[in-house]
Amino acid sequence: VKQQTIHLFVFDTLADWETGFAVAGLNNPAFQAQPGRFRVSTVGIGKAPVVTIGGVTILPDLAIDELAPEQSAMLILPGGGSWDEGGNTEALDLTKRFLAAGVPIAAICGATSGLARAGILDNLRHTSNAREYLAATGYRGAALYQDQPAVADGNVITASSTAPIEFAYEIFKKLDVYSAETLEAWFGLFKTGDAAYYGAMTQPANANA
């Protein structure tokens, strides 16, 4: 199986919890339909270290200007305060290049406001932290806002800051990370804490369906 790289955009103020479930599931071969198919790589505006909202220092694997869409299976954009300050415009330019090349992107929390400001959500069903939060950007897609934890429309996934599990679920579904049965068991386990779902995940038929 040819390994595919998922790129996680990293920047100062990144909200640690929002992409934790997604990147762990992608990078860890356990229970995957094709174990080891994905690896996660970090991309920064430059290659200087960044510090998350939780105080974790991350050294980006590469800079945005070194990344071409054809090298990637998906771009993940976490939330963080800098989006609301009008930052990360380089990541929005990269997002447009990804979508033009037919490569999916996934944005959560503040990153959705960045997409809204860039006009990317004007014609797509989407969600965010709140309808009013995106409306404040002055974007033209308000009629397509969905009051849901996470929404997938074509090659764009969006989610609320309080929905890291649903965000990961939509990413895993889009990329066929797990079999359908394993994906539902994974979601049930982390959403409810019911250990019975773990048993379903470990069934051989589910692990490699």
Labelled PLM ranges:
Residues 54-61:
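Short gly/ser/thr-rich secondary-structure transition/capping motifs
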Residues 42-54:
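Membrane-interfacial amphipathic helices and adjacent loop/beta segments
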